[in-house]
Amino acid sequence: MMLNITDLKKEVESVITSSALTHEQAMIRLSDIPLNRVEFFETTKEFRELCEAGCLCRMSEGNVTYQPRYILPDYEKLFREGCKFLRLDPPKTLFEAIQTLEIFYRHVPSVTHYPVYLGSVDKLLEPFMDDEHAYELIRSFLIFLDRSIPDSYCHMNLGPEATRAGEMIVEIETELKNAIPSITLLYDPDITPDDFAEKCVLCALNCAKPSFANHKEYKKLYDGPYGIASCYNALPVSGGAFTLSRIVLSRLAERAKDSEHFIQNLLPHAARELCGYIENKIEFLVEKSHFFKTNFLVQEGFVKVENFTGMFGLVGMNECVNLLMEKEGKEGRYGYSEEADQLAMQILEKLQACVNEFDSKYCDCTDHHFSLHAQVGIDSDYEISPGVRIAIGSELPLHEHLQHCGKFHPYFKSGVGDIFPFDATAERNPDAILDLIKGGFSQGMRYFSTYSSDCDVIRITGYLVKKSDIAKLDEGIAVPQANATWGYYEVKNSKIYERKVRSL
């Protein structure tokens, strides 16, 4: 047990007295407090020590979960068959299709208590696009999402084909400039027309979405279809991720004598401890909690337990490599030295091997192994770069940076990405940015995000927040978007506003 009444009272009081939280945000935070205070299964002394030192991290899930962290329902099944639990028939009109989605989303849980995957909405709506009121209905739908799912981890997918619905969504989002929902274009240059892709680039420059996912590579990952959920997590549709925990490489490196000690001793030990913890959480979720026994999503086949995996996240590669190089008296730095980059690859190869040595009772869709994930960070991270990104302030020239991404992105089956803001003049050359994306993807890059230096909506690490909302929070004024508070602290701690702005 980890219950301390005095600390518990302080934590509750800090929530209920905060003027920067809405009622719903306060309610959700209060509901999470007990799960962070009580253990439901035994953890090892070694695991607890590594957590207390900040080398391992539970990722705000608490010590137990009662629903999967990321859920990607089969929305096509919903449109084919309807839903008995929610008394929804298969939609026959665009109005019914949108209403069906709006109702269904309300009942899809996640770690944030909001849906993190909205489906390939363009494909879902395309059969109904002959409706003469299509523009008004879709515009109203997008406004509904922004106002009723106040969390930009909710993620819509488009493409790879161009559709009337997809074109309209991009047009309206360019106009609305909302932070919610996040959007990804599943991009394949052999399928996606350049004119549609360029419209997506222009939309991104105006409101930081859509991002571009390398569909040609991602579609190879799973036996069935995949989706991009939450930040940029590539996961199976009709499944998702049971849980996500992470290793903080930079903090672990502080304990190392040198790179050999780090790779051969510290890293395997920490990986084993984290894998054991992830497995314990999955077993509790599947075998003891109610979700996989009684939830309608499971009972009606919208998700299946065999399509879920466990995510093994990492952060701080940049700082880890630089610290190990310093300890060995070497001048090379991550991104700027072949020796430093080779060390990073050795770390990833070793970590992948350690994770693959652990056999999970579940995680059928990833051969009973956990999936490596380049985690984007949390709001309390300080001088810890997301995943394998080069630190803000140390960015490479653009083409070299894209090549660097291409070397490291392929290690991460369940998600990785990089962010490249451009100056305002880039809107005159969307074709040039599209060429950069094509080039990066041909080099192995998996996920590309951009926004314009002068737009209000920006990508923090993997999610979207309005700069104007951050300014309000700075004055203690509540804003509707729940994860804007995380963006506020990441701006303070992670130099988000100092990210290198590119020119064409």
Task: Give the ranges of each region predicted by the language model.
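Conserved phosphate/anionic-ligand binding catalytic regions in large, soluble enzymes, centered on
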Residues: 116, 304-320
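Short secondary-structure subsegments characteristic of cysteine-rich extracellular domains
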Residues: 331-354
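Conserved catalytic cores of very large enzyme subunits
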Residues: 2-306, 327, 333-337, 356-504
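A conserved active-site cap/scaffold subdomain adjacent to cofactor or substrate pockets
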Residues: 267-271, 313-316, 321, 325
